[in-house]
Amino acid sequence: MNPFEIYLLRPPEGGAPADTILDALLGDGRVALAADDPSRAHYRNPDTGAFFSLLLASEVTEAWEARLAAARRAADEDAPPPPEPEEDYDGGEDEDFEADEDGGAEPDVEQAPVIITLPLLVMEFFMREALAFAEALARTADLAVDLHAGTEDGAQASSPAEIAATWLGARDEAVAELAEKNGGAFDLKLHAHHSVRIQLCVWSPAKAAAWWKYGSARRALAAELGPRGVVVPALSAVRHEGTVKSLCEWRPGTPCVLPRTDLVLVRRERERKGLFRTRKIVQEGLVPNEQIWKILAAHSELRAEPADLLVHRSTPPPIAARLEAMALEPLEHARNALLLGVVDLGSEPRA
């Protein structure tokens, strides 16, 4: 399955220097350099779960390595200075392109300071988030966003709508092919000698949108409600009963926001009396979200934005008693999962 690539290209006049591109990449802390390959980086949004890879041109990689070396020298003044680069990129006309038979220039990978590699077997918001990231990077670093490594002179770059439509079409084809050939299962390589079998899972567009809207707004909610002692939990994905479900964590008795997830990881404190002292233990387990909503809804603030959620501030004794009586499903019945292999379609793909 071919990866889907979004190119950030320099305009004919050259664009911003590599350091500006690097500053834009590192701006919000979601991009990290790959440990085993300095030419690759990874984007991950811990609030939404979106992720994708980036391939960096040598000019950006060298700027990154120079910055790391400068930080090391600051910590060790006796370290020798790095060698001077032989030649700086100036964006001029003397680039080493190999002309084709028509006299044009073959595009060089160095034309693209950054290439975003986006997975296909994911929900639509991955693409929307990657496209927004690319457009913001392009504005800051004076780059062009395109579906192609190079465009002919005078040709317009791909529009955001064209990129989105192309990705959606490629995603639908990949899902249909996977469903037809492998029954919706594929192997995910974790490293060179280990892979796991993953079954394709479908969420409704409404469920995917609610996940993304809540995750995108979680920090704003925390800024609003956190000073009042209300916890705003992060979302996570778990594999449970053969499919991937959404989950958040809650401690009964703690003021909190409760989004509409599939499951809630409940952590409740119990007192255990010993011979000489009483100690607190934490009991953990899973509860269907709908069960907790039915108990808390009448005593909580209901909000529809950014997605359906409860703001629960206090727990009257009768409500606390009902919460204490809830049966907890063993935590071992769920395990952490990536959102890779989870797609948002209107119906299940047919084999």
Question: Predicted regions: what is each one?
Answer:
Residues 1-351:
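Acidic (Asp/Glu-rich) sequence patches and key acidic residues
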